[in-house]
Amino acid sequence: MSKNDNQDISEFDPLNREFTEAEKQQQMQQEQEFFSQSILDIVDDGFIVASSSQSTPSISVLSNSLPHGDQKSDPITEAIRKEILEKQRDILREYLANTNPELAAQIAKEEDDKKFRAFLSNQDNYALINKAFEDPETKKNLEEVEIVGYRNILSTYSAASGYPGGFQPVQWENQVSASDLRSTVVKNDAGEELCTLNETTIKTNSLIVAKQDGTQVQINSYREIDFPIKLDKADGSMHLSMVALKADGTKPAKDKAVYFTAHYEEGPNGKPQLKEISSPQPLKFVGTGDDAVAYIEHGGEIYTLAVTRGKYKAMMKEVALNNGQSVDLSQTIAEDLTKVQGPSHVRHTPIITPNQELELSIETHSNQQVPPITTFNKPLQPEISQTHQLQPQQAQSSGIPNLVLNAAHALSISMQDLLHNINASLTQKQDINKQSDLIKEAANTILNNKKSDFAEKQYNIIALTENTLSNKDIIADAKVNVVSALLETIQNDQNTLDIQKSKILEATVAITLNSENIELKQKQQILEKVVDVSLSIKDDISRAVAIDSITDAVIKSNIANKDKEQIFMTIFDQVNSYEFSNITKQKLLGSMLKKAVETKVISPEQQQLIHQNLDKITTEHTKRDTIEKVNNILLDPFSNTVLKTTNIQVITANVLDSPVPVEIKSELIQVVTQKVAESALEPKDKTEIVKGIGKIIATHSDTSLPLYDKGVIMESVAKGIVESKTDLRERELITEGLVNGIYEVKGDKAVVHAISSVIANSNINQSEKEVLKKSQDIVSERVLDKEIQNLDGELKEKNIEESKLRDDIYNKTQDVANELNIKTFLDDNHGKREVSEEVPKNTSSLLNDISQRTIEKVNNLRAMLSQDANLKTFEEKKDESTKKVDELVKAFDNKSSTEEQQNFIKSHLIDNKTLSREVRLQIIDNLLKAQAQKRAETIENLSAKTEDVRVVSGKSELEPISKDEPYIQKAKMVVERDRVGIKDNIKIMGALINARDSIQSENLNKSTHIKKESSVPQR
C-alpha cells in the first residue's frame, strides 16, 4: 500500500474488501454471542406525552405557511422523517432513475424535493411506484431502512440513552371480564389524563392473505386499538407507537420491528389534535369493510397493525381536518411532503426544553435473531494487535454509555482494518492538513455506512478519536487540528440526528479529558471545539442535552479541580457569547451552575461571577418583555388615555416592587418613559401617561423605595424624556407634566431637583437644556407661590398670641369639664374638689405645650420660606451625606484601641439620632468592608514582617546602652506581628453588625411604640 501524501482512503475502504467464508462464519458466531448477551430483543408499544406547560410548540404554530423543508417539528417526528422517510424516498428515486431514465428531471434530488414530491403525489405515477414496491431488492432496502430507522429512533430517544423523559414500558392492564381486553390510561407529565386506550385481541382462523410470492399465510390473531380521534380532557401532546404483530399475534424481534404511530400535537386550545400518521408501507387491509384489519408484508413475513380500515379512514379525515400530514408511504410519500400547513392563529409559546415521555417496553426473547452481516460486522484479523483499542472497561471509566459498550462486542474487522491502515498512512513528516483530511474521510466512511445502526457508528467514531489521540506519529498540537476536523465532520453530517451528535460529543469530551497523550492546553482547545459544535445544534433539546453531557463529562474526568474550574469558566464564556435568546442562555447556564455548585468544582467567587451574568441576562430579558408590554399598551386601539396611563402605572409599580437593584429599576423605568415619549400618541396623551409615571414613583411606599432611590429613578424618567427622539416642544410639555404630577401628589422636592440635575448634565445642546429647565422652573415656581400664598393667608387669619391662646385653652377645658359635669364624690370634701379642679389645669398645661410646639413649627416654616432660607437641593443633601460618612469613617480609623472603636460605634452610630438612618447605615457598610479587606490582606501575606522599635523612653527611637559605651545602641527588632489583630477584628465586625441590626430596627420599634401610645386607654 502506498504511503504518499496524496493517498486516497478508498484504497483501504472496508467496503471494497472481500471476505472468505471462514471469516464470515467466525463473525456470525461472534454476533450470535453478542446478541445472546442482550436482553433488548422484543419490543412493545410505546408512547410519548407532554403537558402544555412543558411541551414543544405545536407544529402548526411553528410551521405556519412554511413548506415542509422549513418546518420545525418535535424531535420524534423529525427523526422519523429523516431516519425513515427521506431515506426511503432516496431508495425509490434510485430505482426509478435506473428503470426509467427519462424521469431524471422529475425526480432529481433537491433541497426540499419539490419535483419528486409532485411526482409521487400524481396518481398517474402510482403504477410505477407499485412496481418499485414489488421489486425484491428495492422492497428489501425499504424494509431495512424502516427497521433500522425505528430501532435507532427508539434507542436514541430512550431513557437508557439519557434522553429526558425517554421510552419506558406501557402498562397494559387486563380487564376482569375478558382476558382479550386490555386498557391503559395515558397521562401527561402533569399527571392529568389525556385518554384511555383499549386494546381488543381477536382470535380467528378464517383470515388468509397472500404474500407477494403467492404463498398463503393464515392470520390466527390480531388486535384492534381504539386510537382517539378527538381529545378534550387535559392539555398536552403525545405520540402513540404500536408495534406490528406477527400473523400468530406475537411480537416480533427487535431487529424486525416496525410501528404504526399516531402523532397528536397540542392545538390552539391546548388539547391534543391528531396531526400526523406514520405507518409501514405498503399498507393493505384484509377485506373491504370498515372492520378489515390492516397488514403489511415485511421481510417475507405478514404483520398486522392495530388499526382497522374504518378507524384508519376516520383518523386520516381528522388529520386533514387539523391541517396535519400523513407520512404513510403507501398513500404516496408526497402526502407527507406536499401538504402545506394551513393558516392558524399563532400562539406565542415559550421555547423551553419539553419534558416529554416516550415509553417502550423491551422483553427477553429466547429465539435470538442474528442480523445480516454488515461492513462493520466481519471477522477479526490478527492485525488488530497493532491498533490501539478502547477496551470496554476503558470506555466505561471514560463515561461512555452502556449501549456503546455493548456495541464494542460487535466491533468488526472492517473498523480494525480502517484504524490499522490510518495508522500506517499517518507519518510525522505528513502535512497537518493531509492528516486532517485522512481522519475526516474515515469519519465520513463510518457515518455514511447505511448498514450500521447508531450504536455501531458511535463506537466506531469513539475508537477513531481514541486512536487519533494515542497516535505517536501526530504531534500534540496537530492532534487538536485533526480531532477538530473529526468534530466538523460530525457537525456537518446530515444523516446523524442532533440528539445522536450530542452523545458522540459527550464521549469525545470524556476521552479527551482522560487522555494521557495530550496536555491540558490541547485538551482545552479540543473541548472548546466540542462546545462550539454543541452550540451549533439547532434542536433545543439536543443542544441542552449536549451541554449537560459535556458538563457531566468534565465533572467526572480525572483532571484536577482547578483545571475543571478553568474549563467550566471557558464553557460558560462560550455559551454566554453565543447568539441565543436570553431564555436559552438562562437555561443552559443555570443548569451548568447548578451542577458546578453541587459538585463544588468552582469557587464561590466564580459562582458569584456567573450569578452576576445570569442577573444581567435576566435584566435584558425583563427589559425586552417590558418593552413588548408597553408597546402593546400604547398601540392598543381600544384603550383611551386614562386606561393606557393606568396600565403603564401598573407596569411601573411592578418594576418598583421587583427584588432587583435600584440601578436596574432605573434602567427599566427609563426604557418605559422613552417608549412613551417616542410613541405616535398625541403630545397631551404622552404628557398624561408620563405624569402618571411620576405620580406612582413619588407616592410609592418609602419602605420599599427610600427617598434616595426615588430620586435616582426619577433621574432615569427625566433621562428617558430628555434623550427621546421626539420634538423639543413635546419634550417640554412632557417634562412640565412630570413635574406637575409630582407636586399634585405632594412629592418630595428633592425628587424634583433630581430632574433638574439630569437636564443640566444631559448631552443635549444648551438651548434645549434652557427650554426644558425653564419649563420645570415655571411649574415649580407656580406651585411654590401658590403654597406660600395659601400658608400666609391662613397664618394672617389667625392672630396667634400666646397669652390669649393659654386663656382660650383653659376656658375651653373648663367648659368641657362643666359639660361633662365633673364633680367630687363628696361636696363637703375640699381636698377632693381640689383634685377635680386639677383636671382642667393639667389638660390645659398639656395643650399649652402642644400649642407652643405648633407655634415653633409655624415660625420654622416661615423662616424656611423666607429669601434667607438655606434650602438644599437633592444633590446638595447627597454630597453632605457623603462628606459626613467620610468624616466619621476617618474618625473611627483614628481610634487606636478596640475599646475606643467600640465606644465610637455606640456613641456616634447607635445613640446619635441626629444623623439620619441612611447615613449611619452607610458608615457601617463602609467600615465592614474596610475590616474585611484588612483581614483578607493579613491572610494573604502571613509572612510579611513589620519593624517594631523597642525603646526605653519616648525621647528617641535608638539610645546608647550606657554612657560608658555610647557607640553601642539599642537594636531594632524586626518581628512578625499580627498587623490586624484577628480577635480584635472579629470584635469590631461583631459590634458593627449589631449596630446595623439596631439601626435597621429603629423604624419598626418606633412604629410599635407609637401604636402602643395611641391605643385607647382602658377605663
Swiss-Prot record:
Its main location: cytoplasm. InterPro entries: Rickettsia_antigen_120kDa. Keywords: Cytoplasm. GO terms for cellular component: cytoplasm. Residues 1-33 are annotated as: Disordered. Residues 14-24 have a biased composition (Basic and acidic residues). Pfam families: 120_Rick_ant. The keyword Cytoplasm applies. It is found in: Cytoplasm. The keyword Oxidoreductase does not apply. Signal peptide: none annotated. This is Antigenic heat-stable 120 kDa protein. The gene is sca4.
